[in-house]
């Protein structure tokens, strides 16, 4: 059970404190006009947000370790640059109509966008710093009709009156086709070799059967809440059971063996017992990150930096893997 504490009235009412089912607490702070200024997680670490006083757009985010990201906008509230905690900057330029015309990635790569229609926001071409050019054509409804890559290879696309893609035609004459029912659900795909895969649905729109080109059928059955309870593939059937919270608690394989799952009050997986009887356990910190897992005689610890980024893991005290 969660308990929410609010402040403010009417449109300025905000959740400022949340007591979670495990007893942990997270908090949020807002300014006088209801804009988020800070969030404190269950471990007591605070992330600060600095909104522009006029537009409300976020101009700066400072994480608990003091690292900051900055965001800059033009007078149309479009993002023009962003600088990450590492100091690398992303930049964007726009034309008089507010359309993106150039984007510079943090690594310095530049992409330019060209437009041939003053009334369209869809580019007709993109060009990178090496001069490689890709072109696109669009329908008046914004559907992609053709794409030409930097080598001149052309791919064309067909759509139905509802905007759904019905065919892809490649330059060498190979085509792929798609068909839909009256509800817009995909019911058939024919590949470039002419092989067709068909799809069937129940009244709720859930995919129930996939019929392969060779006629083999894979099926799925659902409960009244739309959760898959049984799947059949290649003549082999597997079933799933759920608890009252909708979490998978038991899987039964085609040979009748079982895998069971247990969760904590925050819906985090804490134990998995396989069909062979082997049990794996998982432990999380206050913010929900996996910090320890146990698999028979193996104990794995997961380590993070102050920005919650995974840095390394150890197995039985020995470093097994590192990330940078």
Residue ranges with predicted function:
Residues 1-20, 24-41, 45-63, 67-84, ...:
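Beta-strand elements of repeat-based all-beta scaffolds
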